[in-house]
Amino acid sequence: MFKSGFVTIVGRPNVGKSTLLNAIMKEKLSIVSCRPQTTRNNIQTILTEDNYQLVFVDTPGIHKPKHKLGEYMVKSASDAMKDVDLVLFLINPDEKPGRGDLFIIEQLKEVKVPVFLVLNKIDENPQEKVAETLKIYSELMEFEEIIPISALKGKNIDLLKELMFKYIPEGPQYYPEDMIIDQNERFIVAEIVREKALRLLSEEVPHGIAVEILQMKKNEKGTYHIEGNILCEKNSHKPIIIGKGGSKLKKISQYARQDIEAFLQSKVYIRLWVKVKEEWRDNQSLLKELGYKKMK
């Protein structure tokens, strides 16, 4: 008997959805940063074992949108809860349910498939706190399963996989067994660069950073030559991203190259520039160019 199912992971921004997906896959597939809303596109990630295949839709965090990009991200996350076989609602036990959590719960009540409550970061919180949070959420809605985990340390991840297998239906293998992601290489390369920029810039530049890959060519020796722009919204952000004597941009390129080489399994040369595009997050045509679907 072979089973297959589509799973979506929801939760407020920065709760650890991408880290959980990485722990399940044991691969660095989804951009992980300390900043909220760093996952912008629905990324279908495929886990294939001997007797099942799980297709994960990694979504942006659900939040109150402030611009066109925010609207896209919220709609993307809401749409992902439709037509799936299982929903994982990820929370942190050290945070009481806020308006964002209550908003998600109201949507989850309309879902016709099993919903798991997954408590992350249990290694960072006392058992009493975890138990208290469990009680609060259990009174808000009924969950098919409640699983405490540590995504970062991999605690109870195997248990979570076993429970997901239990709930998904019998079905075909939708993707080849060696396929782990349905996004193209350019998309992943752009996400790697953006992650490094977000990490290195910390609080110096607001969240309005995007990456466009201008060129990605592989020569006869198997070496990739990549060129791209880091987009920011204000002229004042540009020198911050570049850094003194180009030091910051050089570090972004260096750290990104290391991860891109690991992903492509090839030597990589990468050149990056910084370009100002004011209010790009409200520019529908530019969002489309960067790979964000048009809002319906």
From Swiss-Prot:
Domain KH type-2: 201-278
Positions bound to GTP: 11-18, 58-62, 120-123
Region described as G4: 120-123
SUPFAM superfamilies registered for this protein in UniProt: P-loop containing nucleoside triphosphate hydrolases, Prokaryotic type KH domain (KH-domain type II)
Keywords on record: Cell membrane, Cytoplasm, GTP-binding, Membrane, Nucleotide-binding, Ribosome biogenesis, RNA-binding, rRNA-binding
Region (G3): 58-61
Membrane topology: Peripheral membrane protein
G1 as annotated region, ranges: 11-18
Location of region: G2: 37-41
Superkingdom of the organism of origin: Bacteria
Subcellular location: Cytoplasm; Cell membrane
Region described as G5: spans on this chain: 149-151
Any GO BP: ribosomal small subunit assembly
Molecular-function GO term, any one: ribosomal small subunit binding
Gene3D superfamilies (alphabetical): 3.30.300.20, P-loop containing nucleotide triphosphate hydrolases (3.40.50.300)
Era-type G domain residues: 3-170
Record has Membrane as a keyword: yes
Pfam families found in the cross-reference section: KH_2, MMR_HSR1
Entry-linked CDD domains: Era (cd04163), KH-II_Era (cd22534)
GO cellular component terms given for this protein: cytosol; plasma membrane
Protein's job: An essential GTPase that binds both GDP and GTP, with rapid nucleotide exchange. Plays a role in 16S rRNA processing and 30S ribosomal subunit biogenesis and possibly also in cell cycle regulation and energy metabolism.
HAMAP family documented for this protein: GTPase_Era
PANTHER family: GTPASE ERA, GTPASE ERA, MITOCHONDRIAL
Quaternary state and interactors: Monomer.
Protein family according to the UniProt entry: Belongs to the TRAFAC class TrmE-Era-EngA-EngB-Septin-like GTPase superfamily. Era GTPase family.
Name used for this protein in its record: GTPase Era
Organism encoding this protein: Clostridium botulinum (strain Langeland / NCTC 10281 / Type F)
Gene: era
